[in-house]
Swiss-Prot record:
This is Enolase. Its EC number is 4.2.1.11. Binds a second Mg(2+) ion via substrate during catalysis. One of its GO terms (biological process) is glycolytic process. One of its GO terms (cellular component) is cell surface. It is found in: Cytoplasm; Secreted; Cell surface. The gene is eno. (2R)-2-phosphoglycerate binds at residues 165, 338, 367-368, 389. Belongs to the enolase family.
Length: 426
């Protein structure tokens, strides 16, 4: 009997994310010498129904320390998992879910559980001498995702007046992932010059995800800026736009309306605004266009914005129960997958499979609080997701994912870049 995959040691510690906030890092060792480690990300605009990120609420780090989550790994989870076969991912995840005993992972913390879940998968892959994408996806993992690069930041990710959170470029006309990265990087530098010319050199400061955060006041102004950057780079035919409205962040529950540019706007009016934008600019995808609880509104938006990818992030929070409801209603047509929203690798894969089985596209995503950890790059390829959203081609915690994908494409030799087939990449 091969015991080389047996978990030999699990250890967690508190480290920092890209915003200087504490997060959980976990390391897993197997008896066969396999090693895996993961640093858990953290979001700024979070869905109400996300799994619980356990914070200490003490004076340290302004209440954001995660020492309790770290202790939960070292003192509780580790004791239960030592000796388990690291290849039994679903069993290991279920053991942790049983230990926690809550629907939202509020006892042990999703940050504790996820750190171990991903580190176990990495340790198993290392023991098997396989790259993570191949360990999870097998020989069928061959699709390189089209990157959605967030080059203009607003909302919770920046300090400007923009209501929408992310203005992204997606190089669907590239022939490979490496070429896609080049196109985006060149456009990013082109946009930097446009921003400097229009707003001054002091305006080329960047937001949490590496995109520029100039003093833009309107959504139309931001889109026009983006278009000029793409034109100057020479990629009008290759690059399209995607948006993350993060509409829950500017929704006023008391009045049931959205505050856009300082004015109250109804759901119908906001959908009309999206229609106007889609008609004027090369927008192919809109994430969280409406309030996270408005399944009916999402259904209408999906019907009205024909041909546009409507992505559910805060709407679904990578949760199969919420995704099932959306599928049954026809709310949205795409799932944004964030592993820390749900808290285990198994549940993340379940959500991806449910999306694909029901004709929903898939976007694997980072969080605004990231690290040098590049796990989601491997996951995007393992799932043949077709799309990945992990920030601008700037800041080390963002480029770490892009660089890993460049390596994976090189290693695969025969792969398919999703490109224009980003919705149905296989």
């Amino acid at each position: 009997m091969d015991d080389s995959f047996d978990i030999y040691e699990i250890k967690a510690r508190q480290v920092l994310d890209s915003r200087g906030n504490p997060t959980v890092e976990a390391e897993v060792l197997t008896a066969g010498g396999g090693y895996g480690h993961t640093i858990v990300p953290s979001g700024a605009s979070t869905g109400t129904f996300e799994a619980v990120e356990l914070r200490d609420a003490t004076e340290k780090y302004g209440g954001k320390s995660v020492l309790n989550a770290v202790s939960n790994v070292n003192d509780i989870i580790a004791q239960e998992l030592i000796g388990e076969d690291a290849r039994n991912q679903r069993l290991i995840d279920q053991i942790m879910l049983n230990l926690d005993g809550t629907e939202n992972k509020g006892n042990l913390g999703a940050n504790a559980i996820l750190a171990v879940s991903l580190a176990v998968a990495k340790a198993a892959a290392d023991t098997a001498s396989l790259p993570l994408y191949k360990y999870i996806g097998g020989c069928n993992a061959y699709v390189m995702p089209a990157p959605m690069m967030n080059v203009l930041n607003g909302g919770q990710h920046a300090g400007n007046a923009l209501d929408f959170q992310e203005f992204m470029i997606m190089p669907v006309g590239a022939d490979s992932f490496a070429e896609a990265v080049r196109m985006c990087a060149e456009t990013y530098q082109s946009l930097k010059k446009v921003v400097a010319e229009k707003y001054g050199k002091d305006a080329v400061n960047i937001g949490d995800e590496g995109g520029f955060a100039p003093p833009v006041k309107t959504i139309d102004e931001a889109l026009a800026l983006l278009l000029e950057g793409v034109k100057r780079a020479g990629y009008e035919d290759e690059i399209v736009f995607t948006l993350d409205s993060a509409a829950s962040e500017f929704y006023d529950e008391k009045s049931g309306s959205y505050i856009v540019a300082g004015e109250k706007v109804s759901t119908d009016k906001l959908i009309d605004i999206y229609k106007e934008m889609v008609a004027q600019y090369p927008i192919v995808s809109i994430e969280d266009p409406l309030f996270e609880e408005d399944f009916e509104g999402f259904k209408i938006a999906t019907q009205e914005l024909k041909g546009i990818q409507i992505v559910g992030d805060d709407l679904f929070v990578t949760n199969t129960k919420r995704l099932k409801k959306g599928i049954e209603m026809g709310a949205a047509n795409s799932l944004l997958l964030k592993v820390n929203q749900i808290g285990t690798l198994s549940e993340s894969i379940d959500a991806a499979n449910m999306a694909f089985r029901n004709g929903y596209s898939l976007v694997v995503s980072h969080r605004s609080g990231e690290s040098e950890d590049s796990t989601i790059a491997d996951l995007a390829v393992a799932l043949n997701a077709g799309q990945i959203k992990t920030g601008a081609p700037a800041r080390g915690e963002r480029t770490a994912k892009y660089n890993q994908l460049i390596r994976i494409e090189e290693e695969l030799q025969i792969s398919k870049y999703a490109g224009k087939d980003f919705k149905v990449p296989f």
